[in-house]
Amino acid sequence: MAGTLPVPLHVELPQGWESAPPDKVGAPHAAFVGLHKASQGQGFTPNITVTGRTHEGSASLHGLAEESVQRLRENVGSVDIAKRTEVGTSTAPGLVDAPGIVQNLRIQADVNGQPMELAQSQFILLIQNEQQRGELVEIEVALTAKTSQLDAVLGDFQDFLAALRPADPTQEG
């Protein structure tokens, strides 16, 4: 069953991307998955996933980033952290006050029986749940692509992040 987000978010896929049911593309815990249409059928389709979960009290961004890497290691295999940087979210309207962290990862994975080198760029942020006082919401947005595909889709990922914002209560995802 596909995951849900603890807070509603408005997402806009860049041109050339399409949403896909998380369960059908092997991302059952994701609340949202976008696929790069032009790359389908090339052994690996670059994808953007959005997941979320709640935390009572406080949470450390670096701790959350480490947990994400550990989950990947348990589920996929070898993961190396290429870069990790704390960031503000001023480029994402509506999420300006939320602290965030970006980490770029190199992943050695087995995809359809073939060894593959993947790159993943994760943006992890913490926001206050306006509906639940004292509750923090972790949102993880990740772009995953073959290292050879990364340059072609990284700009789209940045556009996706720039458009990400809390949903208007009258809007849907």
Region roles according to the model:
Residues 1-70:
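Secretory pathway targeting signatures of secreted, lumenal, and periplasmic proteins
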Residues 11, 104-109, 141-143:
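Preference for bulky hydrophobic residues occupying beta-strand positions
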Residues 17, 137-173:
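Surface-exposed amphipathic alpha-helical segments
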Residues 44-49, 99-102, 134-142:
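Glycine-rich, often proline-containing surface loops adjacent to acidic residues and nearby aromatics
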Residues 51-55, 71, 140-148:
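Short, solvent-exposed aromatic-acidic interface loops
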Residues 56-59, 112, 148-152:
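A generic structural signal for short coil/turn motifs at secondary-structure boundaries
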Residues 65-130, 158, 171:
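Signature of long, low-cysteine stretches enriched in small and polar/charged residues
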